[in-house]
Amino acid sequence: VLIALGRWLQHSGYRVGVISRGYRSQALDEARQVAPNDDSASVGDEPLLIRRELEVPVVVGRDRLQALHTLIQDNAIDIVLSDDGLQHYQLPRDLEIVVLDGQRGLGNGRLLPAGPLREPRERLEEVDWVLERNSDDPHSGFEYHISGARHLASGRLVVWSDCLGQWGDQTLTAMTALGQPEQFFQMLTTQGLTVKTVSLPDHDVIMPQHLTGIVTETVLITEKDAIKLSGSIDSRLWVVEIEVQLPASLLTGLHDKLPTRVQT
């Protein structure tokens, strides 16, 4: 969602910057700007993916306020997007967007550790927008769409309709280290693909030993998995290109709330 929002802001003429904690990265104690050639162990997989996809300044660090100061001090920025920063109350903000899974909702509605919530559900009444994946609500619902697949070793990109024609009668392997892997697997099966699924712990790296014993000719992974790979690449790996279509009501609302960008 953040990448889709960042792209829309860029197309609207805004200079975008991003701050993030950089989960499981080595760059936590002091704010650090992410370089395109960094590795995920140093800065975190999600910040590195954001940096490469949007080609905008990204700063990681445990102290979000320090990360913000580093970002705006070193770069010309119109809008700062904070990745997963709702509870960082020292961080000033103009707009708040919460993203939920429409199927999971708020779980049992209880706060950690008894439930999944970081704050009471009433907090949602204070934010500017609540977006829900897998929701039929035209104002808040959004979906992920598969646009194609990229052969990781060669970089060859194939549109999704051609992928379905090529793989429709095959059994594939889908492997990922996402926190909610079932969403990725479901996206593939609803497209009519037959997949054997392999789930790794969230943020883990797909290693050669994970691929040992897999007999299928094609292994599908996500961009978040691919960003962590280096060295020799298994020729069976294909990266599924997934895009987010943001609800029109959000984009219209942002257009009305954001200041007009004056081109210089």
Regions found by a protein language model. Give the residues of each.
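Conserved beta-strand elements of the Class I
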Residues: G17-I19, V98, L172-M175
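Acidic beta-strand-to-loop metal/phosphate-binding motif
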Residues: T218-K224
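C-terminal accessory "lid"/substrate-recognition subdomains
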Residues: G105-T218
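Hydrophobic residues at beta-strand termini and immediately following loops
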Residues: L100, F142, V198, V240-E241
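Phosphate/Mg2+-binding loops and adjacent switch elements
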Residues: G22-P138, G148
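Short, high-confidence coil segments that cap the C-terminus of an alpha-helix
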Residues: Y14-R15, N75-D78, D169, T216-E217
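Walker A (P-loop) phosphate-binding motif
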Residues: V1-P36
